[in-house]
Design a protein with these regions (language model features):
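N-terminal glycine-rich FAD/FM-binding segment characteristic of electron-transfer flavoproteins
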Residues: 1-117
């Protein structure tokens, strides 16, 4: 594995009902600190349905770029579609760091992604 291909700090920005969760904004702050130390950028991963309008708020809280995956099957959290969508982002973008909040959703999603990526 060529680690030089991996760069940038990615944050899973959890939203429910079209409202960003506080943990997403908190993680963007931490991601900004990490990215600054590594001379990299912060990418927010936003999944859901009709959520693109939340991108501006994510940029205002420290995201350099926002990757939006908008699909009706992502309107409410379900394990497999969210896991697959983020796994595809990770495979394509090759982030050096991925931050996921320690919420109920994050505790379901994080280990599944870790198992698929490794």
């Amino acid at each position: 594995m060529d680690k030089s291909q991996y760069k940038n700090v990615f944050v899973f920005c959890e939203q429910r009902g079209g409202k960003l969760q506080n943990v997403a904004l908190e993680l963007l702050g931490k991601a900004h600190d990490l990215a600054k130390d590594l001379n990299q950028e912060v990418y927010a991963m936003l999944l859901g349905h009709n959520v693109k309008s939340l991108s501006e708020e994510l940029i205002a809280h420290g995201a350099d770029k926002v990757l939006v995956v908008d699909d009706a099957c992502l309107e409410n959290y379900t394990t497999e579609p969210y896991t697959q969508a983020i796994f595809q982002i990770i495979c394509e973008q090759k982030p050096s760091i991925v931050l996921i909040g320690a919420t109920t959703i994050g505790r379901d999603l994080g280990p599944r992604l870790s198992a698929r990526v490794t």
